[in-house]
Amino acid sequence: TYLGRDFLKCCGHDQKWQGMTEVFEKLKAYNEKKLGESGIDTLVTSCAECFRTFAMDYELEDMKVMHTTEYLIENGFEMDLAVSEDVTVTYDDPCRLGRQMNIYDEPRALVKAVDGVDLVEMEHTGEDALCCGVSSMMSCNENSRALRLQRFDEVKATGPEIMLTRCPKCVSHFEGLQFEGEP
């Protein structure tokens, strides 16, 4: 069953990590009620932060919470995809998906399944992956910028044409470098 994009409200990840407990609890109560009424037994989400929040901070009795990459691998999804020209990519392990939820292999398996894609690893991967520097969008300052630049130096040293990640915060934070005149 596909519940649709508007079925739930925000998972409340940022509110929780910003200390907005009352707002988080309201979002959580609303979503738990909607999910409980839905009759589904598995909740699949593509957002690393939603995955972590639903799996660890919600009480979803008898409901399995999975990341999209886990679900696809576990259910034997056949990619049968190819790129028009060979491409080299690297994969950035998001903090929430990797270190907090131990999802490292599934995203890589899906990337490797695409014909013509060569996955190269950065110096720091898996549990040792460097953070993009953002935490609930609260710390976009010079310190977080230094973390972004350090991680992007690793990307450049690896030599890929594309960097992939499964976290919307990482994407927006890395894209911010373009507006600052960086890579």
Kindly label every feature range from the protein language model.
Residues T1-P183:
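Iron-sulfur cluster-binding electron-transfer modules in prokaryotic oxidoreductases
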